[in-house]
Amino acid sequence: MSSRSIVFMGTPEFACPTLQALIDRGERLLAVVTQPDRPKGRGHKLMPPPVKELALAHDIPVLQPHRVRASAFVESIRQLAPELIVVVAFGQILPKALLDIPPLGCVNVHASLLPRYRGAAPLNWCIINGETETGVTTMLMDTGLDTGPMLLKRSTPIDENEDIVSLHDRMASLGAELLAETLDGLREGRIEPQPQNDSLSCYAPLLKKEHGLIDWQRPARQIHNQVRGLAAWPGAQTLLNGHALKLFRTRVADGAGAPGTVLCSTGGQLEVACLDGSLLIQELQLAGKKRLDSASFLAGCPIAEGTLLGGAATERPIP
């Protein structure tokens, strides 16, 4: 099977399995384009994106433009003359001048069943909204936000207790598999691009810290979904005696009481009332402390039954 000349564009860990799949297939990777190194941690040390580290480990040239719309960058890609550009969670909108360069087009791997959940955080919002199924779509890119013609789709169920960390890893692998299948299908002429139905679309906007603020005046299931969907970042949080308390793992229960009230804090269990039902908090973290299971947390930080969690600062609904 003849290889294609490809420029790969991606940034986070999610994109790494797809890049690795291209390497393993023997595709001719002319360059990898990724976001600039960013300061991280308390020391604000510049850290390379995961995709950059993988590319350098395989001696693939790396480009890190601050703006992909810059004419100098577009010209550098034109000089490489790729047959195809593959994009996975790159992080910038590509201009038409760049999209027009490869004769075979630009193929994007998007982590949703398009046209639903276009945008920056599809997996998180799928979970937050209580979806029971999601998937991956490959598409030919146009100048819109995830609006191009679809190539292939692969669906997968979401368990009611699965969080974003688990789903992210599964979908990253699924995306790599689907991209390989897509490239084979395009090479063999087996794929007919399908237009998206815009009337069925919805958007998954970039996450903000305020999306993590818990409003206990909501049903337990909705708060549970919020915890699952934000477990990686920013974390769902409330207040305990004025201190930020992040929740990482919960289960829905059928307790009743005033929303935000601690119903049970004995036997290693921490149960909090919601508008409809209650939550069993199984893993949590107080500001400045370690992330712990509920039994370990309560052993070091007892919470009296009847304690009210939250307050004016946290009682804001998720948009």
Swiss-Prot record:
Pfam families: Formyl_trans_C, Formyl_trans_N. InterPro entries: Fmt, Formyl_trans_C, Formyl_trans_C_sf, Formyl_transf_N, Formyl_transf_N_sf, Formyl_transferase-like_C_sf, Met-tRNA-FMT_C, Met-tRNA-FMT_N. (6S)-5,6,7,8-tetrahydrofolate binds at residues 112-115. One of its GO terms (molecular function) is methionyl-tRNA formyltransferase activity. It catalyses: L-methionyl-tRNA(fMet) + (6R)-10-formyltetrahydrofolate = N-formyl-L-methionyl-tRNA(fMet) + (6S)-5,6,7,8-tetrahydrofolate + H(+). Coiled coil: none annotated. Its EC number is 2.1.2.9. It comes from the Bacteria. GO terms for cellular component: cytosol. Keywords: Protein biosynthesis, Transferase. Attaches a formyl group to the free amino group of methionyl-tRNA(fMet). The formyl group appears to play a dual role in the initiator identity of N-formylmethionyl-tRNA by promoting its recognition by IF2 and preventing the misappropriation of this tRNA by the elongation apparatus. Belongs to the Fmt family. HAMAP family: Formyl_trans. NCBIfam families: fmt (TIGR00460). This is Methionyl-tRNA formyltransferase. It comes from Pelobacter propionicus (strain DSM 2379 / NBRC 103807 / OttBd1). The gene is fmt.
